[in-house]
Amino acid sequence: MKKKLLSVLLTGALAASMFVGCGTSTETTDTGAATGGDTATESTDTGSGAAGGTKVGVAMPTKDLQRWNQDGANMQKELEAAGYTVDLQYASNDVQTQISQIENMINSGCNVLVVAAIEASSLGEAMDMASEAGIPVIAYDRLIMNTDAVSYYATFDNYKVGTVQGEYIEKELDLKNTSDKFTMEITAGDPGDNNAGFFYQGAMDVLQPYIDNGTITVKSGQTEFSDVATAQWATETAQSRMENILSSYYADGTDLDICLCSNDSTALGVENALAANYNGKYPIVTGQDCDIENTKNMIAGKQSMSVFKDTRTLASQVVKMVGQILNGEEVDVNDTETYNNGNAVIPSYLCDPVFADVNNYKELLIDSGYYTEDQLQ
């Protein structure tokens, strides 16, 4: 099965990537710049209480991406509503900061840890400490690699995210039936994020046959994950790379038909590059997360689609799992085969991602209360 093979391959790739490249509830406010790197933090007492003094530590990677702000806020709201004290921390995309935050959560008596890792293979020291303290760990959206400390994994179906993107391109260009030829460039995610490989592989499993038969040409020649990955999902990095591709391969007037972008922050960088350096027919641009700026771009015709991952759903599932762990109950999972972290296959709960475009964004995002209309003006 392709996903099983991918999980084995990613274990090796992520290991290699290491060489490159709670009393009151507190929330660490990330004051870093737009792509991370500034590890300055400021702790703010949010003053939550909990039945029985049960504490849950929530470690988020950064506030630089909109989605992590939403994940953290949803998690805190759901956990506090369930009666727990929440120690919510953001680490400004700095691994050592995140390790210190997790260690502080352990030392301050947190009963369960929910961790969205900055780098999948870099938390071994903190995970060992959690394991020795007997504290269960739920890996949140990003699988923590090469440790036996991870009890459960909660995420979206990451392979499906990629297939949704690939199938959208396949359908929009009628690739199964057309005799036309198309050009494509690929912008993938952070090589330190286990999910990025699943997104990439899901899309490429749909599109690779069309590359192989000549229907799609990648003029830059950059198709391997290692060539198209974007460190820390940074918009500026994606923009700079796409500007170089446009000037090197499309300045002669060749149309670029497809920009396969794994998520919205990389898509935004690609869209910025297109606006500044490209005069041809506007390409299909994919994305993921339905960030506000990207949803605005969908409305304006600058992004073709995104994949909506309702973080409220994921937060609710994690809160349910926390309660089941603390009550000694069987924990709900729906995947016990796909996600191998290098030590073991981690019992996982996968939420469903949803296709979004200009035709259904109002129903998905506004009618559901995820955004207000004013936010998308």
Q: Language-model segments: which ranges?
A:
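Sec-dependent N-terminal signal peptides
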Residues: L6-A13
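C-terminal motif of bacterial Sec signal peptides marking the signal peptidase cleavage site
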Residues: S17-G21
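A residue-level marker of the well-folded mature domains of exported/periplasmic proteins
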Residues: K2-L5, C22-Q377
